[in-house]
């Protein structure tokens, strides 16, 4: 009887555990040497950490509940019908935030405004029961519910902002209240009354109403008594300064019905600095320059003529430039009046010299001066030291500074613009007339022109600035 092989049995019994342990060691060693294993694990750990961090920073919102709420609200909802149709008018509370105004284009009579426009109304179809009080939604939801058909009545062009996404916001409360806001840039019409230009003030309106719903369907109301404005220092008004604003509500009657019209009036006052430098000061200096002609010798024909023509042409250029910043209105503005009067003064200075030169150049020597030397004739002294009447009825002026006369009134020698000796000075038909010496026209002009221009400026500025 052979004895049992204990070692072989023991070897078969213990060989399996030992082999398994060895294989486990080798597998762990190979896995530790594999480079992607640890990195994959670290990435997974990082993703878990980021995911946990997101959940920590963001409040837990039951997204499934919001989706269910929206689906329930939109189920059977008809966005073509206004709230409470056939029951009562829909009340729209409006509000506005003025981000900026400007520039104002006087030629096209329009201005640019950037606003945030808000509308609030109640829609009972959008009520929901949930612990969520308000649904904060983006612009994708706007087209799925009813929105008021508000339009700006005096807008020439309006642009909504789309960068980086449409600048529109929608809020729905659980009681059915809806808030809809958007940002707009509008080129609105403003009828400028330029009678007092450039000392004018304007109230530029921004009007809006419903496009298709009359007062029986939609009623607009201001949410607040006044409109809020941003920092006016960043506004591009340039020639204007912002004075204030006011908002009103009115009803406009049309053939299609009565519409509630909401208006905001922006009060603007023009700044005169630009036009003072560009127009008023140059025109005044040109007028003063034309007076230099009165101190130049009357025999200096080229100098005085060149000065007069130059000032007239300069005034013509200034008047043309001043009109470029204005629309082609048919009435006279304050600047037109000032430029026109300045042109009249400059042109009158040129005409004054033309008149003076004409009469001075047409002087003639006394015809009887040589005759008196050759054939002395007896005379009767009627006016000592002023005039003598000769037998041949020729009248002469004998003054210390005049040896010439002017032909006037039946061939008699004339020494003044309005008066001729002797019939002129002593005649009853000339009684009370002003006696003006043509030779002294420059002296008269030196006083008359500055005085008249100063009086005009006094009346002009007082009338337009204080009356």
Swiss-Prot record:
It comes from Pongo abelii (Sumatran orangutan). It holds the Pfam family Neur_chan_memb. PROSITE patterns: NEUROTR_ION_CHANNEL. The gene is GABRG2. Palmitoylated by ZDHHC3/GODZ; required for the accumulation of GABA(A) receptors at the postsynaptic membrane of inhibitory GABAergic synapses. NCBIfam families: LIC. One of its GO terms (biological process) is chloride transmembrane transport. This is Gamma-aminobutyric acid receptor subunit gamma-2. One of its GO terms (molecular function) is GABA-A receptor activity.
